[in-house]
Amino acid sequence: MKILQVASEVAPLAKTGGLADVVAALPKELRRMGHDVRVAIPFYKEVSSGNLPVRKARKSAEVALGGELHKGYLRQTALGEVPVYLVENRDLFGRDHLYGPPEGDYPDNPLRFAFFCRSVLQFLKRMDFRPDVIHCHDWQSALIPIILKYELGHDPFFNRTAVIFTIHNLAYQGVFPADALAQTGLDPSLFSVDRIEFYGRINLLKGAILAADAITTVSETYCHEILSPGQGCGLEGVLERRQADLAGILNGLDSEEWNPSLDRRIFRNYSSKSLAGKGADKRELQRELGLKAGASIPIIGMVGRIVEQKGIDLVIDLLPRFAAEELQLVILGTGDLRLMHQLHEFRNKGVKNVSINLGFKEPLAPKIYAGCDMFLMPSRFEPCGLSQLIALSYGTVPIVRRTGGLADTVIDVTANPREGNGFSFTEFSADACWDAVQRALAAYRDREGWRKIMRRGMLRDVSWRSAAGKYEELYRTCADNRRG
């Protein structure tokens, strides 16, 4: 099949979160399965300053939006054997950030991503590349299913193209004031309750949910959770309307990038058969971060965005308890300025067993996964989560809140001693989180039992093979339905 993946980021070209990893790994696996898979993202400033060679494809697009004509150019590079198309417009994408500075999003984001989506559709025609499936990711690509259904529904070039739309995080919906409609180029008739209108505003994610041939989320549990008012973010009714076309497909992990037996970024390689190298990684992490050396001191790691979704506010409340325990805590991340300020204030107290590293330092992340004994993810909600998959692969036992993809991948040792690969808690509270930490610390004292827990996690297949097979099946079903 011919498949185009459309997203706002792909690793390592442009990345702010897990979306970029998915859009890098899924096409690679589909390519191995014999499909003609390509990727389209904007040509951001950070892409142009990267190391991959980028060539101009001598194709241009013109899009009228907001009363102005915007011109774009097509550039091309590749990630392995996967071609990557880059939509260039320096005014719109030649900026320092993908979506906006720390203070907030760029106000013209609806125009920026409308231009991107419309340019992609123009370039497909100019290249004469007719995808069987266009797979769109998150609100930044939401205009593609909307345009194909309501504007180009009778266009012979696209009438056999199925559109899959994946929700990576329902909290980000592409909601804008009603007067931003002109920036999208959509007909005003689409500003209605059964199209893109949402409480007097534009909601691009809603429009994509209603327009796509099929909708997926990134784990089975999250797929069920978003049908409830608690996690539906106001769209539970819309999702319920499309429930027959909604599926949860658990993300995989790129086992070429994240493999402790091959990873060149860590101090010493190791595997489930030979764990000795993990001890060396622990010693090196302690040395690098100025922590007290000691093989018997448990280290708990956290890597990710410093935002309330990730439960970092629980961890901040628990910092005095962590500081008083015979353990070490390592935090790496960047995000919400208020939460980062609270972490900075605690760091200034000079607590010796807590290492807080603000700002995302890419080389440190794999060292934390390899060098820690446990990995903490107390998320409020977690559509899928990649960090716990990495932790499992690296023998770093996850401690998680039982939600979304965390519930689908981490089996609690307390509830299931024979198959457990981590520790979990249900209630979103500091005490419930601390109870799970204490259960993990108690299990850690049984060294042989702990190694069994580590190995169970490392032996779990978290690769993209299974997920790619499910996507392939969905693609075929939707493409066949399109052909009639």
Curated annotation (Swiss-Prot):
Can you name a GO cellular component term?
A: cytosol
Function comment = Synthesizes alpha-1,4-glucan chains using ADP-glucose.
The catalytic activity, as recorded, is: [(1->4)-alpha-D-glucosyl](n) + ADP-alpha-D-glucose = [(1->4)-alpha-D-glucosyl](n+1) + ADP + H(+)
Q: Which family does it belong to?
A: Belongs to the glycosyltransferase 1 family. Bacterial/plant glycogen synthase subfamily.
The organism of origin for this protein: Geobacter metallireducens (strain ATCC 53774 / DSM 7210 / GS-15)
Q: What is its EC number?
A: 2.4.1.21
> Which positions carry the signal peptide feature in this UniProt record?
none
Q: In which pathway does it act?
A: Glycan biosynthesis; glycogen biosynthesis
According to UniProt, the name of this protein is: Glycogen synthase 2
Which Gene3D superfamilies does UniProt cross-reference here? Glycogen Phosphorylase B
Alphabetically list the UniProt keywords: Glycogen biosynthesis, Glycosyltransferase, Transferase
Main enzyme class: transferase
Q: Which domain of life is it from?
A: Bacteria
- The UniProt annotation places ADP-alpha-D-glucose binding at 15
MF-aspect GO terms: alpha-1,4-glucan glucosyltransferase (ADP-glucose donor) activity; alpha-1,4-glucan glucosyltransferase (UDP-glucose donor) activity
Q: Name one GO biological process term.
A: glycogen biosynthetic process
| NCBIfam families in the record | glgA, PRK00654.1-2
